[in-house]
């Protein structure tokens, strides 16, 4: 639902159905947005529940991937653990054939961001976090299980502290745009309820998009940061993990549709208690996808995805091979009105 109250004031309410989740039908996003009139310098703002402006793959009123079925590792994680209740403002100035923009926001919620990334690791899928949804965790080590629930609710707010993010954009005179974002949920690391504790999760995200001729577009993102929980001890934090991921995506109009190829790289580095709880991981993935329009409101997708990763805790906690690889071929029909 996208009500347009005036030229300057609009809204969006998005509800999604995802079979097999803790809430099959739930609120996706809901916010009011404002934009100033046409001018060289413009201001816009929004307030409500939404994803921060991180992904270059997602868009539209339902925050879906535009050129494939499965997003990158970077944006799969953003989709499942980085949703906020926020007030966001953006100031943009155009000069000549280029522009600069600064976006800043203060938010609450998203206290549990980092739990999945630490205890499960990276994943590639199209499941998105909704307001009331929770995700199951894999089997935990004996040292962690007494202090962590078997599920995580990433959107919860348990410490009452506000976080922030800020983003800088430059649209160059050439068909190239770049952006840099800093995110910090400012979790206090000790507040909690129902065996879920506020995590301190901070990261940088750098993105770029370029047109390579009339029919080809390249997109890339690099995300790196740290997440930790619990009090500092002489032996380190109970959980303290550095993480990083990147992808390069090339899309070309082909045969009346669009062909996309993407390569992903991702890793985590555990900084504490590795002997008892080794959350190190490294892996990569490759994807080929073809999107073909059937009508002006329906598209069909075919996607081939291969993922390989090495994570020691799979063997230690779940008796699964630490080194895993999967190949998936899937199709999807997407209808929009």
Model region roles, listed by residue range:
Residues 76-80, 156-158, 196-198:
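Short Gly/Pro-enriched turn/cap motifs at secondary-structure boundaries
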Residues 142-188:
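Loop-centered beta-sheet repeat module
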Residues 46, 75-83, 134-138, 187, ...:
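Short C-terminal domain-edge/linker segments immediately following a structured domain
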Residues 26-28, 43, 59, 83-85, ...:
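Residues that flank catalytic or metal-binding motifs in active/ligand-binding sites
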Residues 1-120, 169-176, 249-252, 258-264, ...:
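Outer membrane beta-barrel
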Residues 30-34, 38, 58, 175-337:
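Outer-membrane beta-barrel pore domains
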Residues 114-121, 125-159:
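Flexible glycine-rich, low-complexity coil/linker segments exposed to the extracellular/periplasmic environment
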């Amino acid at each position: 639902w996208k009500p347009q109250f005036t030229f300057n004031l609009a809204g969006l309410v998005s509800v999604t159905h995802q079979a097999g989740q803790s809430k099959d039908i739930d609120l996706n996003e809901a916010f009011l947005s404002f934009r100033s009139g046409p001018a060289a310098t413009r201001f816009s703002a929004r307030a409500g529940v939404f994803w921060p402006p991180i992904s270059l793959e997602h868009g539209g009123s339902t925050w879906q991937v535009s050129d494939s079925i499965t997003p990158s590792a970077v944006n799969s994680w953003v989709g499942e653990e980085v949703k906020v209740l926020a007030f966001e403002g953006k100031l943009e100035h155009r000069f000549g054939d280029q522009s600069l923009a600064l976006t800043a926001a203060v938010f609450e919620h998203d206290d549990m961001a980092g739990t999945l990334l630490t205890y499960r690791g990276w994943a590639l899928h199209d499941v998105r976090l909704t307001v009331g949804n929770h995700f199951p965790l894999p089997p935990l080590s004996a040292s962690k299980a007494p202090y962590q629930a078997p599920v995580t609710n990433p959107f919860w707010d348990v410490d009452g502290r506000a976080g922030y993010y800020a983003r800088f954009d430059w649209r160059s005179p050439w068909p190239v745009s770049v952006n840099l974002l800093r995110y910090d949920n400012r979790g206090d690391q000790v507040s909690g309820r129902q065996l879920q504790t506020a995590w301190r999760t901070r990261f940088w995200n750098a993105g770029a998009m370029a047109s390579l001729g009339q029919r080809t577009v390249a997109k890339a993102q690099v995300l790196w940061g740290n997440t930790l929980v619990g009090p500092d001890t002489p032996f380190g934090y109970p959980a303290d993990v550095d993480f990083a991921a990147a992808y390069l995506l090339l899309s070309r109009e082909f045969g009346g549709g669009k062909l996309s190829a993407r390569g992903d790289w991702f890793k985590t580095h555990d900084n504490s208690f590795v002997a008892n709880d080794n959350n190190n991981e490294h892996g990569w993935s490759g994807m080929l996808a073809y999107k073909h329009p059937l009508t002006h409101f329906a598209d069909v997708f075919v996607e081939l995805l291969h993922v390989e990763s090495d994570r020691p805790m799979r063997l230690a906690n779940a008796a699964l091979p630490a080194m895993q690889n999967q190949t998936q071929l899937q199709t999807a029909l997407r209808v929009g009105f």
